[in-house]
C-alpha cells in the first residue's frame, strides 16, 4: 500500500507513478543507486525528488564525452586538440549562443552531462583517505565555497570499476563519497582542474542538489559563458 504524500517513504507502486516508469524500472534505478530503497518495497521519497530534479537538466540533448570536455576546456581558457577544427568552431559558436540565453548556464549543465557519470558511495573507515589519492579533485574556492573534506573528484572509469571490486564499494544516492567516472583522458581532466580558470568547479556546483552550491555554481557558470563570449576566458 502506498504511503501518504507527507510521509518519508513510498511504496514501489507510488514511486513508479511519481517517476512515470514501471516498477521494474524503479528496481533498476535502485540497483544503480540513483534512488534509495530503505526496506522491502519502500523507497526514500527524498531520493525520488532529487532524481527528478536532476532529470530537469537532462531535457537538453547531451553532447558526446569528447565534445563536453571540449566545452569545459574552452570555457576554462585552455586549448582543445582532440576535436577537429570545424567541430571546435561550431562548439565555440554554440557556447556564445548559450551566453546570450538567460538559461544558458542551466542548459550547459545538461549539454555537458556526458563528461562523467556521477556515482555516490557510502564511506567507512579507511576508505576516504585511500580514495582521495585516486581522484582528480576540483577546488571550489573561486566560487566562495570551502573545499569539501569529503571525497569528490574525477576518476577513470576502469580504475573506479577496479576499486569497486577491491574495496567492495557500496553505491548510495546519499553516500558522502562522490566519484565522477569518465572514460576521457584523465590527464587532460587533471590539466583542466589544475590550470583552468574554475569553469569546471562552476559546472560541478551548478549541477548540485544543494541549493547554496547550485546557486553559486550557476552564477559563476553564467559569468564564465559571458567571459568566453567576450574573449576573456583566460582572465
How does the language model describe each region?
Residues 1-29:
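Polyanion-binding surface elements
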Residues 56-135, 140-142:
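Helix-turn-helix/homeodomain-like alpha-helical modules used for DNA recognition
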Residues 125-154, 159-170:
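Glycine/acidic-rich beta-strand-loop module
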Amino acid at each position: 500500500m502506498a504511503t501518504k504524500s507527507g510521509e518519508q517513504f513510498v511504496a514501489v507502486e507510488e514511486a513508479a507513478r511519481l517517476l512515470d516508469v514501471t516498477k521494474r524500472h524503479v528496481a533498476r534505478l535502485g540497483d544503480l543507486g540513483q534512488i534509495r530503497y530503505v526496506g522491502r518495497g519502500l523507497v526514500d521519497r527524498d531520493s525520488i525528488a532529487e532524481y527528478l530534479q536532476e532529470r530537469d537538466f537532462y531535457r537538453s540533448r547531451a553532447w558526446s564525452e569528447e565534445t563536453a570536455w571540449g566545452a569545459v576546456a574552452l570555457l576554462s581558457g585552455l586549448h582543445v586538440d582532440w576535436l577537429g577544427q570545424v567541430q571546435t568552431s561550431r562548439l565555440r559558436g554554440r557556447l556564445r549562443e548559450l551566453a546570450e540565453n538567460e538559461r544558458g548556464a542551466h542548459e550547459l549543465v545538461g549539454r555537458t552531462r556526458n563528461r562523467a557519470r556521477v556515482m555516490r558511495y557510502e564511506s567507512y573507515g579507511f576508505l576516504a583517505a585511500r580514495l582521495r589519492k585516486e581522484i582528480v579533485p576540483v577546488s571550489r574556492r573561486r566560487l566562495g565555497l570551502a573545499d569539501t573534506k569529503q571525497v569528490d573528484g574525477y576518476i577513470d572509469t576502469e580504475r573506479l570499476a577496479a576499486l569497486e571490486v577491491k574495496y567492495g564499494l557500496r553505491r548510495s544516492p546519499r553516500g558522502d563519497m562522490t566519484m565522477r567516472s569518465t572514460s576521457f583522458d584523465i590527464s587532460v581532466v587533471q590539466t583542466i582542474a589544475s590550470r583552468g580558470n574554475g569553469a569546471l568547479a562552476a559546472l560541478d556546483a551548478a549541477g548540485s542538489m544543494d541549493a547554496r552550491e547550485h546557486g553559486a555554481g550557476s552564477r559563476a557558470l553564467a559569468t564564465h559563458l559571458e567571459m568566453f563570449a567576450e574573449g576573456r576566458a583566460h582572465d
